[in-house]
């Protein structure tokens, strides 16, 4: 059975798309820790990131790097944090969070954004990604 993230990447479940390639898909987290909190997933279903084959993992990180640059271009910040947890959905994924301090990486806190804010955020990241 397809995972939640596979369905999102395939367009079966709506998402706030930030970037995509033939192998990877990036979209806003619907329960963001900070504005611009983006999830990056491989289209190929793999439960655990470190079970990915070496080349796929390398390509995944390069794609995530490009998404991080787009996030930073759209929403200037000191850094874009990369977090791998992988317990909530059984599909490898990377959290990218624009941060200005370590306190910004607190998964117990969330920001509420309207649908319009989410659409605008995704569009801004998507447009920045296309320019890279």
Model-derived features with residue positions:
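HIT superfamily nucleotide-processing domains
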Residues: 1-132
């Amino acid at each position: 059975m397809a995972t939640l993230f596979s369905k999102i990447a395939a367009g079966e479940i709506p998402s706030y798309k930030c970037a995509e390639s033939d192998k990877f898909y990036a979209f806003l987290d619907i329960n963001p820790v900070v504005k611009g909190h983006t999830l990056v997933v491989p289209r190929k279903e793999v439960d655990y990131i470190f079970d990915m084959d070496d080349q796929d993992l390398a390509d995944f990180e390069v794609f995530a790097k490009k998404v991080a640059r787009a996030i930073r271009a759209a929403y200037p910040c000191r850094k874009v944090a990369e977090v791998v947890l992988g317990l909530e959905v059984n599909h490898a994924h990377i959290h990218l969070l624009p941060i200005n301090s370590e306190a910004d990486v607190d998964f117990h806190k969330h920001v509420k954004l309207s649908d319009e804010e989410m659409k605008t955020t995704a569009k801004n990241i998507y447009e920045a990604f296309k320019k890279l």
